[in-house]
Amino acid sequence: MAELCPLAEELSCSICLEPFKEPVTTPCGHNFCGSCLNETWAVQGSPYLCPQCRAVYQARPQLHKNTVLCNVVEQFLQADLAREPPADVWTPPARASAPSPNAQVACDHCLKEAAVKTCLVCMASFCQEHLQPHFDSPAFQDHPLQPPVRDLLRRKCSQHNRLREFFCPEHSECICHICLVEHKTCSPASLSQASADLEATLRHKLTVMYSQINGASRALDDVRNRQQDVRMTANRKVEQLQQEYTEMKALLDASETTSTRKIKEEEKRVNSKFDTIYQILLKKKSEIQTLKEEIEQSLTKRDEFEFLEKASKLRGISTKPVYIPEVELNHKLIKGIHQSTIDLKNELKQCIGRLQEPTPSSGDPGEHDPASTHKSTRPVKKVSKEEKKSKKPPPVPALPSKLPTFGAPEQLVDLKQAGLEAAAKATSSHPNSTSLKAKVLETFLAKSRPELLEYYIKVILDYNTAHNKVALSECYTVASVAEMPQNYRPHPQRFTYCSQVLGLHCYKKGIHYWEVELQKNNFCGVGICYGSMNRQGPESRLGRNSASWCVEWFNTKISAWHNNVEKTLPSTKATRVGVLLNCDHGFVIFFAVADKVHLMYKFRVDFTEALYPAFWVFSAGATLSICSPK
């Protein structure tokens, strides 16, 4: 039966560490005692977490008894009780059957020798010599003998002065045969039987307690091991963070050095001009000073002929006032460097603020599981071999769209470009990092509308995909429900079941953004799809298959759809929808566009085909217009 030992842990509740009692199973597949799990969730409250894997449930799951596991536990407990304990397993100590030599009972007849037996009728203890009459005389034949008993008075009933030969488990006391009348509703037993029963109960309790002590020891070891794992993980992450911050400090130091050098170079340039001007002015001053001295000297001459000869020469020499040319620092350059530094500081503050915000839980309702995305089993449009063979470029983390630059215009230090190069090096070793994709997604969620418009593309509706009930106008940028069926010529890409139309161009890589104006905001949808999406039947409707993703307005309800799974969204008064498609990092975001952009829903998907903008209109008067950037 040694194989039952490892099974004991599998059949134990991780909350109470005991074998399952009325076991129930959670949706995530873990088993617990029904009472343990109910008490845990009652204290915990919403949201409800699985005590083992920490899976989150917004609503309390409906629990049912696991009858198969219950039967297995019962059979295990029966087998566990039936099997003999192995040699290396602890067993309770045996109860002493005879008094120790130090606690001998004296003979009540001679008071010298040690008693060998006690007569429960005579209520006396006898040595071997004085016990002989009980063996020889017929009068003593029915007297029960027991090993020597100390303090016989305790064996007598104080009420009836009779020997207490029975034990009442209900009142936990020994009673005589006359007391049985008062305990007729109880279940008394003989002293030997009651002693054996209690001994068996206590032995089993000790065995259970020993098992619990072992379980507690294992739990303590497990907690210590988990603490060690947490400590090692935290230390490893701290080292990684320190490395990242060291690199950021190096970038900041390099930026500071470059900016300081540019300003110093500008200072040197201006001072060099001032030095040149100073030398010119010094020479000019010397020339004027020499001319002044010559004039003063000529005025001292008394000979008129000599004076006229000298003065006529000096009179022809002209002088001009001293002129200082305009020389200033390049204030535009200095202001640009200073403003770029302020912008960088503000960007850092915003990034630090986002880091300090509480992280959303894993059960984010505004996010779709990429595992639910599959290829359509009924392709209509084939994808070229070149597209299938083409590899995705390594994802690059999106940096703020307007990072500052430093230095003179001819030698700019672009931190954004430096960040992209560093990110490209990082992604070369981890091309499919989920954490990197999550960071890029968070970066785009924090962008403003002007920043999103940097990725704007012009969407043209494809005439060959439009349903006969969809009218196209305004140079194929407006789709509406036609009052009369349109006589479009047959085409294999045309929708025949749902009033839908696709964009003309597909997108396999890169980042793309477009906006759609909704009129009437009723019975319409905006999304994306693979070119292989069905064009016929109910599965061709946007979001009702694995090849399309959309946000849909149906009466007053707004929903996100994919793979025929609906997620109800909060209502919005915005009449314009922005769609951001990031093929490289695998996500599409739907924004409600007003004065600011607000998140409606996001899907994270590892796209496998080229994607087309997709639109659905149904109700009369419903119109979708492709917007121009404003």
UniProtKB/Swiss-Prot annotation:
Residues 180-450 are annotated as: Interaction with influenza A virus NS1. Changing residue 117 to R: No ISGylation. One of its GO terms (cellular component) is cytoplasm. SUPFAM superfamilies: B-box zinc-binding domain, Concanavalin A-like lectins/glucanases, RING/U-box. GO terms for biological process: antiviral innate immune response; cellular response to leukemia inhibitory factor; cytoplasmic pattern recognition receptor signaling pathway; ERAD pathway; host-mediated suppression of symbiont invasion; innate immune response; positive regulation of canonical NF-kappaB signal transduction; positive regulation of DNA-binding transcription factor activity. The keyword Phosphoprotein applies. Functions as a ubiquitin E3 ligase and as an ISG15 E3 ligase. Involved in innate immune defense against viruses by mediating ubiquitination of RIGI and IFIH1. Mediates 'Lys-63'-linked polyubiquitination of the RIGI N-terminal CARD-like region and may play a role in signal transduction that leads to the production of interferons in response to viral infection. Mediates 'Lys-63'-linked polyubiquitination of IFIH1. Promotes ISGylation of 14-3-3 sigma (SFN), an adapter protein implicated in the regulation of a large spectrum signaling pathway. Mediates estrogen action in various target organs. This is E3 ubiquitin/ISG15 ligase TRIM25. It comes from Homo sapiens.
